[in-house]
Amino acid sequence: MGAATYIGSTTRYQTVAVCPLYSFRLETGSTTKVSVYHVSEEPDIEVFEPRKINGAGEALVWAIDDARLRNYLVPRECPRVTFYAGPRTSVVDRERFLGSSVAVVAIEAAWFARLQSCRLFCYHLPAHHFTTYDETAGYLVSRTAVKPTSVDCISDPVAAILQRGVELRILPNLWSLRDAVVESTLEFSIIRWRNASPR
């Protein structure tokens, strides 16, 4: 999978404004409590209006649950491969891809400087507006406009990722990792792949 730089718990990054773990009840017929967020580089969003993706499909407001918030603590357009072990993940794949890590967010080295310098805004959203769209990816959707209840500024996204117990993996190119993960038994999300460097 190529050379990699691993940024672990001994990182020099210390300060960060991290989203508090507020819990809301998600009305999907279960009693599961989740936190609902939308991460943006825009600091002043007053209301999230339903929008169509690329002008097609149903207009929706998209949000992310707390467990997969880690996948969005990077610049919006940053290509990344994210993965973790699920119920069907084999012991071999767990050891090969994760080692002792709970989850991995992998980005290209070319994006690391932008990750270090970006400022993100984590909007807390009222969960009663949302239903689950994709449990593996942590996607939630609302068909009506949603006003955030609060917003946190994440001034150091690298520290925010690490504080969630996630391994941040920096690679020269993501293609080999992406291909291997897709063929594995891991749970994964591949995000903003159109922006990935060529093979």
PLM region spans:
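ADP-ribose/NAD+-binding catalytic cleft of ART/PARP-like enzymes
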Residues: 12-58, 75-76
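Conserved NAD+-utilizing ADP-ribose enzyme module
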Residues: 19, 24-27, 74-199
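Surface-exposed flexible segments
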Residues: 44-61, 133-149
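N-terminal cationic amphipathic segment used for targeting or macromolecule association
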Residues: 1-3, 15
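Short, surface-exposed beta-edge/turn micro-motifs
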Residues: 32-35, 57-61, 67, 109, ...
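Compact, glycine/acidic-enriched structural inserts
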Residues: 67, 71-74
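Short, flexible beta-strand-to-coil junctions
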Residues: 38-44, 65, 125-130
